[in-house]
């Protein structure tokens, strides 16, 4: 009779059984944890509707504040550029309008959030025992933090607009000085020759003036050959000066409009600051009322504790009441013994 050693097979089967049993237990444990989490979520959804709504609204406001801060940083970079060389007034105006709309929308959302917090506090004042003071304090801290961040962003926006206005005014003064200097320049031969040289280089670089230069050169050659006097160069100079003055006037008008837009935006930001200050004042009044209510509750609790201690002392000193209680207990004990 041949005997085979199957110890290794038995050990392998035992290991495989242990692995299967371990995996089965882990699956059961995961299922139980999922059921417990679902039950806990179902139990807490009814109690935490206002809290979840408050948290969702606060997270949305925080996201809007962060996006507004990014736009404000971009606007600050654009506003610090020199308006004469590298300027983009259209993009600056669009960013200013977008930031202004975002600030107004965030202000309205903060008002709604503060109203939601007020309704939550007023709805739970009757059941102070079931109310969690940590949740109320957390909501209060969240509202105060969002108001502070919004105040900082509004202040930064106002500073950026004031810096932009300062640069615009400086550029406007510079252009006015340049135009007055060019208008009252001395008319000597040296300045005329320098201006003619600059005009020649400008005309050579300008493709629209090449035909005019060719015609003027031909007329100059004909007049020099025939001995006649002609001044087409002076006509072209006058035309170029008129074009330069028109372009300067258009540029100054655009700058004036940009300055007016910035001034109106600064005024609107000031109005938003006033609204934010009123909101902060209302929050301060609400906090003071909550503190007063907490003080009243502390006084009531201390008074109730004193009354309970007095009643306990009175019961302890009343021996006749203790004798009555003892006698009643003894009578019930005797009746119970007799009945049994």
Curated annotation (Swiss-Prot):
SUPFAM superfamilies, per database record: t-snare proteins
Q: Does the keyword DNA-binding apply?
A: no
How does the UniProt record describe the way this protein sits in the membrane?
A: Single-pass type IV membrane protein
Entry coiled-coil feature ranges: 146-173
Question: By its UniProt entry, which InterPro entries does this protein fall under?
Answer: SNARE, Syntaxin, Syntaxin-5_N, Syntaxin/epimorphin_CS, T_SNARE_dom
Keywords on record: Coiled coil, Golgi apparatus, Membrane, Protein transport, Transmembrane, Transmembrane helix, Transport
Give the superkingdom in one word.
Eukaryota
| Pfam families registered for this protein in UniProt | SNARE, Syntaxin-5_N
Q: Where are stretches of biased composition, namely Polar residues?
A: 39-51, 189-209
**Membrane spanning stretches:** 320-340
Entry's Gene Ontology molecular function annotations:
SNAP receptor activity; SNARE binding
Q: Give any extra note attached to this record.
A: Present with 300 molecules/cell in log phase SD medium.
Q: How does it assemble?
A: Interacts with SLY1, STF1, SFB3 and GOS1.
Instruction: State what this protein does.
Output: Required for vesicular transport between the endoplasmic reticulum and the Golgi complex. Acts as a target organelle soluble NSF attachment protein receptor (t-SNARE).
Q: Report the sequence similarity comment from the record.
A: Belongs to the syntaxin family.
What protein name is recorded for this chain? Integral membrane protein SED5
The gene from which this protein is expressed is SED5
């Amino acid at each position: 009779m041949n005997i085979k050693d199957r110890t290794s097979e038995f050990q392998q089967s035992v290991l495989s059984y242990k692995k299967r049993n371990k995996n089965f237990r882990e699956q059961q444990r995961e299922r139980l944890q999922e059921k417990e989490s679902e039950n806990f979520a179902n139990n807490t959804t009814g109690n935490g509707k206002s809290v979840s709504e408050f948290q969702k609204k606060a997270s949305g406001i925080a996201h809007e504040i962060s996006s507004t801060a990014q736009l404000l940083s971009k606007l600050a970079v654009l506003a610090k550029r020199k308006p004469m060389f590298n300027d983009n007034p259209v993009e600056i105006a669009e960013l200013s309008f977008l930031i202004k709309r975002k600030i107004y929308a965030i202000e309205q959302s903060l008002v709604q959030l503060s109203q939601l917090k007020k309704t939550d506090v007023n709805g739970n004042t009757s059941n102070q025992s079931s109310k969690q003071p940590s949740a109320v304090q957390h909501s209060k801290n969240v509202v105060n933090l969002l108001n502070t961040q919004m105040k900082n962003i509004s202040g930064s926006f106002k500073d950026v607009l004031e810096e932009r206005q300062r640069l615009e005014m400086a550029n406007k003064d510079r252009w006015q000085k340049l135009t007055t200097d060019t208008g009252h320049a001395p008319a000597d031969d040296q300045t005329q020759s320098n201006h003619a040289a600059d005009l020649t280089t400008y005309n050579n670089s300008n493709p629209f003036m090449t035909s005019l230069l060719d015609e003027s050169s031909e007329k100059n050659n004909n007049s020099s050959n025939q001995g006649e006097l002609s001044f087409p160069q002076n006509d072209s100079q006058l035309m170029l000066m008129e074009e330069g003055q028109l372009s300067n006037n258009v540029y100054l008008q655009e700058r004036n409009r940009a300055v007016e837009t910035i001034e109106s935006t600064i005024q609107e930001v000031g109005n938003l600051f006033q609204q934010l200050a009123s909101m902060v004042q209302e929050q301060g009044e609400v906090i003071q009322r909550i503190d007063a209510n907490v003080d009243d509750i502390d006084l009531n609790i201390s008074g109730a504790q004193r009354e309970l201690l007095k009643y306990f002392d009175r019961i302890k000193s009343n021996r006749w009441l203790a004798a009555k209680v003892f006698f009643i207990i003894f009578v019930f004990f005797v009746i119970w013994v007799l009945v049994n």
